[in-house]
């Protein structure tokens, strides 16, 4: 069992983009930015418990940080991990919410 503290550290933020919006509408898939050391099992458990939905599958990828230059100095952005979480039929996560 994963501790509650770890569950809260696994999911960092929802990743909102054109591609993720299309995926949400067509495939019932939500995209999250997750901790770089998070496993698929941890992501699945975190989404299921935090949002109270049933998760079908989780696909992950690591985006490599780009090299950036400012004047004569060069630096590198951090690597980060993204998770595509497919929800069960009929399940939905509303990030926008808003007053009705």
UniProtKB/Swiss-Prot annotation:
Keywords: Ribonucleoprotein, Ribosomal protein, RNA-binding, rRNA-binding. The keyword rRNA-binding applies. Belongs to the universal ribosomal protein uL23 family. One of its GO terms (cellular component) is ribosome. Part of the 50S ribosomal subunit. Contacts protein L29, and trigger factor when it is bound to the ribosome. One of its GO terms (molecular function) is rRNA binding. Disulfide bonds: none annotated. One of the early assembly proteins it binds 23S rRNA. One of the proteins that surrounds the polypeptide exit tunnel on the outside of the ribosome. Forms the main docking site for trigger factor binding to the ribosome. One of its GO terms (biological process) is translation. This is Large ribosomal subunit protein uL23.
């Amino acid at each position: 069992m994963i501790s509650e503290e770890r569950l809260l550290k696994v999911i960092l933020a929802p990743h909102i983009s054109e591609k993720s919006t299309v995926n949400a509408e067509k495939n019932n898939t939500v995209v999250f930015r997750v901790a770089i050391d998070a496993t698929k099992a941890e992501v699945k458990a975190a989404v299921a418990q935090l949002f109270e939905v049933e998760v079908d599958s989780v696909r992950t990828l690591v985006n490599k940080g780009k090299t950036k230059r400012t004047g004569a100095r060069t630096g590198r952005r951090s690597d980060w991990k993204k998770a595509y979480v497919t929800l069960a039929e009929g399940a939905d996560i509303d990030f926008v919410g808003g007053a009705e």
